[in-house]
Amino acid sequence: MNRIIKKAKTLKGEITPPPDKSISHRAVMFASLAKGQSRIKNFLWAKDPLSSLNAMKSLGVEITITDSKEIIVNGKGLHSLKESDNVIDCGNSGTTIRLLSGIVAGQRFLTVLTGDDSLRYRPMKRIINPLSLMGANIMGRAENKFPPIVIKGGFLKGISYEMPIASAQVKSAILLAGLYAKGETTLTEPHKSRDHTEKMLKNMGVNIIINDNTVKLSPVDHELNCFDITIPNDFSSAAFFIAGACLVPDSEILIKQVNLNETRTGFIEVLKNMGATIEIFNITEQGGEPVGDIFAKSSSELKGINVQGDIIPKLIDEFPILCVVATQAEGKTVIKDAKDLRAKESDRIKAMTSELKKMGVKIKEFEDGVEIEGPCKLIGTEVYSYKDHRIAMALSIAGVIAEGETTIKDANCVDISFPEFYSLLEMLQK
């Protein structure tokens, strides 16, 4: 499905973004490993988290959904999973296939994991190597590069592992395998990635010690606690509307009850450094995470800056929309140390370079990032989403500041994380 975007005169209103995708995945997976009944409210009913929910059902977990869309997971404990009688399809979800690999690495049965056309070309060596070191028998296609992957779990041992890249998915896979391992599991990242897994496992009674970029998980000799959680709303989804408010003249948007985990909010820090007007208030706690309301409004003078180093993992999902913001900033914006973006749902560095060039942007591509010279007058044209939800939404925000009409090809990929995106965008223009 294609979507035509027209230039917006203003964006005004109040929105509630969808529930957090990362926490939705983890809630349904971790509840499946706990002993007892867990209740999950405000789950993200989108394709990616549903891949995780259906995967756990395939492994024998009893999951029911109430009329009010609350999920009830009857967990039978760490060692209660059963071998699936079929290949488990993880859809488009890298989170599902990587976290699930860590879980089934500790099971004494065979599991085969695959996904859609995009997922079958996502790199898997980054989890296959450490899980193999822990004792799992695990193989992937094309010399362990890609899915499908076959895992014969068994007796695991804890390892001390230096991660070559900062990745919450890889970190989580190893920590989940560590739940089944004999001995301590220690991980060190080059930069700190999002920490939802550590927070949630701690709340379930797992002994986890965090020291800067190092996480240490002690052997688990008891069942994990079940839990009730109301999932906060997704910062990465809110980011598109934060950017829209900053870029479209005479705009004001209030975004309600957003997850403000410090490992996720680098985008706000960068936008403020560029001169954006953004306020955060009504901060409380929900689901073990800080949440609050975000108010963003038009920013008349943005300036280009350098974005690199420790902040990159804190805005890794916001790279596409940050590129769009940079097109309207005075001077050069340079984004570096983001090579892992080449292995997301699409090659996001290549995709944003290609599509923004079509819209008239001065953009240079590096191996690990981009340089954008602004401000640029964007020209509406036909652009391609690469079937990547974050590319589609970023280009849609580019469309609302471009002259003429912008056509987003394969725009329905937004259903992966944010099915209501276009209806909210239209509502803010009325």
UniProtKB/Swiss-Prot annotation:
Active site, per annotation: D317 (proton acceptor)
Pathway field: Metabolic intermediate biosynthesis; chorismate biosynthesis; chorismate from D-erythrose 4-phosphate and phosphoenolpyruvate: step 6/7
Where in or outside the cell? Cytoplasm
Q: Where, by residue number, does phosphoenolpyruvate bind?
A: K21, G94, R122, Q169, R348, R390
**The organism's place on the tree of life at top rank:** Bacteria
Q: Name one GO biological process term.
A: chorismate biosynthetic process
Which top-level enzyme class is recorded in the Swiss-Prot or TrEMBL entry? transferase
The protein's Enzyme Commission number = 2.5.1.19
Any idea which UniProt keywords this protein has? Amino-acid biosynthesis, Aromatic amino acid biosynthesis, Cytoplasm, Transferase
Per UniProt, 3-phosphoshikimate binds at: K21, S22, R26, S167, Q169, D317, K344
InterPro entries under this entry?
Answer: Enolpyruvate_Tfrase_dom, Enolpyruvate_Tfrase_sf, EPSP_synthase, EPSP_synthase_CS, RNA3'P_cycl/enolpyr_Trfase_a/b
Q: How does it assemble?
A: Monomer.
Family membership, please give it: Belongs to the EPSP synthase family.
Name of the featured protein = 3-phosphoshikimate 1-carboxyvinyltransferase
In its UniProt entry, the species of origin is given as: Thermodesulfovibrio yellowstonii (strain ATCC 51303 / DSM 11347 / YP87)
